[in-house]
């Protein structure tokens, strides 16, 4: 596996949009008893449903720990690859690599692949005092292992960053939240300008849209963008929304809308906002909380906690949209309709019982990581 000391942008790489063609999707397999209830069995069924849904559109690789490999293999169809990999938890959007591509080799680049991966630093969303669990040593190696398996060049970065904290349009614009990226539990030594500079060098972006805050209740990640707002296509975003002025989310959504309405992207386009209504407020039940082993190794999951449920946390596959369903008949149906209208060339697949994932702090986008298709160089075609 090649490694490089120069920045990805110097080699011609950039992060493509999620709707660009994929080679495959990576997913981790849940097992932490202190985060997933009933020994993670209900969550495993939903993860399997997500993997199966995506596999109808593109190849899927599921990574499972040595103790869970056989169980994962049994629960998943044969066309889904299952590989053994240790992890502290199964949030591959955040512990997995950020894949980057280039259209053609750059003259002075020593790297011969048109795909590479960024291996960011990771501290379990906050480090020793604020993180979601005490030991993330296995998670730190996930990106490196995935890139080694695929023999893809690796760019390592000391900056702490999770994939769920960035969204790009593939045309130079990056969407982020101040709540997460400027949080003192991530990179306290870096200014906003320094963070932008590093993301320009590593993601190949030129401009940023900073939303002040993420989704209300998304305390685990300190307001990841992927639960709040995402690009649907260049110049168009989907924004988590509520009309209920008594819901603390209302203020956040209005604030974000104001920023977006006054923003232009890297190509000079005004941003069009499509509102994607959140479900009616969901809370962890006593029964759900009691099914989780609360042993002090991970943050407690308490009954009555507002769940960070949002339909923006969907995944774009090749020709498919894999979207969470929360058991709210009106909002679930409406989310499918809005996503179908927004992505007319994709089939929208709703995943029932996505609540099992949100009980542990994330959703479908958080558990998936796309590996883009490697662009074929013009030079390789002999033109």
Curated annotation (Swiss-Prot):
It holds the Pfam family PAD_porph. GO terms for molecular function: agmatine deiminase activity; protein-arginine deiminase activity. Inhibited by N-ethylmaleimide and iodoacetamide. Its EC number is 3.5.3.12. GO terms for biological process: polyamine biosynthetic process; putrescine biosynthetic process from arginine. It catalyses: agmatine + H2O = N-carbamoylputrescine + NH4(+). It comes from the Eukaryota. InterPro entries: Agmatine_deiminase, Peptidyl-Arg-deiminase_porph. Agmatine binds at residues 220, 226. It is an enzyme of class 3 (hydrolase). Optimum pH is 7.0. Pathway: Amine and polyamine biosynthesis; putrescine biosynthesis via agmatine pathway; N-carbamoylputrescine from agmatine: step 1/1. The active site is at 366 (amidino-cysteine intermediate). The keyword Iron-sulfur does not apply. HAMAP family: Agmatine_deimin (MF_01841). Belongs to the agmatine deiminase family. Mediates the hydrolysis of agmatine into N-carbamoylputrescine in the arginine decarboxylase (ADC) pathway of putrescine biosynthesis, a basic polyamine. PANTHER family: AGMATINE DEIMINASE (PTHR31377:SF2), AGMATINE DEIMINASE-RELATED (PTHR31377). Forms homodimers. This is Agmatine deiminase. It comes from Arabidopsis thaliana. The gene is AIH.
């Amino acid at each position: 596996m090649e490694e490089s000391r120069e920045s990805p942008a110097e080699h011609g790489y950039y992060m493509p949009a999620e709707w660009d063609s994929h080679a495959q999707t990576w997913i981790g397999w849940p097992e932490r008893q202190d985060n997933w209830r009933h020994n993670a069995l209900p969550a495993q069924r939903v993860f399997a449903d997500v993997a199966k849904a995506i596999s109808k559109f593109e190849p899927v690789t599921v990574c499972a720990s040595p103790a869970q490999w056989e169980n994962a293999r049994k629960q998943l169809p044969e066309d889904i690859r299952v590989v053994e990999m240790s992890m502290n938890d199964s949030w591959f959007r955040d512990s997995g690599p950020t894949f980057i591509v280039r259209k053609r080799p750059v003259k002075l680049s020593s790297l011969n692949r048109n795909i590479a991966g960024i291996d960011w630093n990771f501290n379990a969303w906050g480090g020793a005092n604020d993180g979601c669990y005490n030991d993330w040593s296995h998670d730190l190696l996930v990106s490196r292992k995935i890139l080694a398996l695929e023999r893809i060049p690796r760019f390592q970065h000391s900056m702490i960053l999770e994939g769920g904290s960035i969204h790009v349009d593939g045309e130079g614009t990056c969407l982020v939240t101040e709540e997460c990226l400027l949080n003192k539990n991530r990179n306290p030594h870096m200014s906003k300008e320094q963070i932008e500079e590093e993301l320009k060098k590593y993601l190949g972006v030129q401009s940023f849209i900073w939303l002040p805050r993420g989704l209300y209740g998304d305390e685990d990640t300190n307001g990841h963008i992927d639960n709040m707002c995402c690009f649907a296509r260049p110049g168009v975003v989907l924004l988590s929304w509520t009309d209920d002025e008594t819901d603390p989310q209302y203020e956040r959504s209005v604030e974000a809308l104001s920023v977006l309405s006054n923003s232009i992207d890297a190509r000079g386009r005004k941003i069009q906002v499509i509102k994607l209504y959140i479900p009616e407020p969901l809370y962890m039940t006593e029964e759900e909380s009691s099914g989780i082993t609360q042993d002090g190794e991970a943050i407690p999951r308490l009954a009555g906690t507002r769940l960070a449920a949002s339909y923006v946390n969907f995944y774009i596959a090749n020709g498919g949209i894999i979207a969470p369903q929360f058991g709210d008949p009106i909002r679930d149906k409406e989310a499918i309709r809005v996503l179908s209208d927004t992505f007319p060339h994709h089939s929208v697949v709703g995943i029932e019982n996505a609540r099992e994932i949100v009980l542990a702090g994330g959703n479908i986008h958080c558990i998936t990581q796309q590996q883009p298709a490697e662009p074929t160089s013009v030079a390789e075609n002999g033109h």
